[in-house]
C-alpha cells in the first residue's frame, strides 16, 4: 500500500485531502506543529472515513530542519500544503513569507533524498495574478513581485517559483515529478474548527462584523474540488510539470450575501458604492 506525506495536517484543505487519500486506499503520514492537535485531526477525518491503521503523525516546523527527512521517509508521494495564511499580522514578512519559502525548501530536499515519485504543492492564484490588472489569467501568468504586492502574494509566488527552479536545477538527476495547484477562494464545509481563510469572508458576512458588501468580484472553488485536484495531480500521468488553476466560478459580494439571505442567514443588504471600495478593506 502506497503512502503519502501531507504537510500541515490540521488545515482546512489538508483535512479534506487526507480523507480523500484514505478513501482511495492510501496510507497517510501528516505533520503538525504540535502533536497536541493529533486527536483533533483524527476526529475531523473520522467524519469522512475510518483512520484505523491508515493515519500517522509527526511534528515539524517550517522554520526548523529537524525531522523532515524522517517525516518523508517511506512515502511514495508528497502533498505540501503547510504554509502561513493571512492573519491580522499578515503584513509581517517574517511571519508569512519566510516560513513559506523555507518550508518548501525543507520539504523538497526531504522528498528528493527519499526518492519520492511526485511532489504536489498547494500554491494559490495569488501567485498567478496578484499584481497585474488583467481580466483573464492562465497558468503562464505570474505575480509581478517588482510591484507593491502583499506579503501573502509574495509568499505564494516565491514558494512556487522555488519549486520550479528546484526542479529545473535537478532535471535529469532525479525521477521525482512536480505539480502545483493554484486555488482561488476555497469555500465549503470544514471538518474542524479551522474553517480556512476564505470561509472567514462568509463568517464575517453572517456574524455582523461586516455590515455592508462591496461590489467586488472574487473567484471561488469548492473544497471538495480542490481536494480532488490535489489527488488527481498526484496520480494523473499528464499532470507533472504543470500548474493548475483551481477556480470554478466568480461571484460579486452582493450575490454571495443574497445566497446567504435566501438560505436563512442574516447577511448585510447594504451595498457600499464602488468608489468607496478602495477606502475599506475586508
Residue spans of the language-model regions?
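Active-site Tyr-X1-5-Lys
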Residues: 147-178
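Conserved Rossmann-fold NAD(P)-dependent oxidoreductase catalytic core, especially the SDR/UDP-sugar
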Residues: 80, 84, 90-152, 171
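NAD(P)H-binding glycine-rich loop region in Rossmannoid oxidoreductase-like domains
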Residues: 46-102
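A conserved pocket-lining segment of Rossmann-fold NAD(P)-dependent short-chain dehydrogenase/reductase
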Residues: 89, 144-149, 192-193, 199-221
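N-terminal Rossmann NAD(P)H-binding glycine-rich loop of SDR-like oxidoreductase domains
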Residues: 4-26, 31
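Mid/C-terminal beta-alpha module of Rossmann-like enzyme folds, strongest
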Residues: 229-282
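Substrate-positioning beta->alpha
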Residues: 197, 212-234, 242
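Glycine/proline-rich active-site loop of Rossmann-fold NAD(P)-dependent oxidoreductases
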Residues: 172-175, 188-201, 233-244
